[in-house]
Amino acid sequence: MKYVKIEEIKGYEDARINVGTADAEEMLDSKTALRMFAVNSEPGEDVEAWVKVQKVIESIGRSNGYIEVEDDHWTQAMKNKKKGAAQVLGINCPQILENFDALVSDEVPVKKMKQSINE
């Protein structure tokens, strides 16, 4: 399995996101994945992570697509279909959601994500 590394996220430098299918050609590089998540996100609170995950899966065009998130601090990789994957991202990697806009562009983002994650 091929993982997508997300090096820019402080505190989650070793986190990896694998979007798509088991075919390596279908995998997204981190910049593309982050950009797709950010561009396709919609305003909301609890639904933000789910919208991002679903949009990426839909854009890949695979109904059996999944997102695998693996962190060296966890005992094993977590594989979840669709909404489960969003919950893993939103609950266990809040910095990923908080930093999308800053990571995908050198320009100041036009649309800021709502502060929906309480620390």
Regions found by a protein language model. Name each.
Residues M1-E119:
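Positively charged, low-complexity terminal tracts
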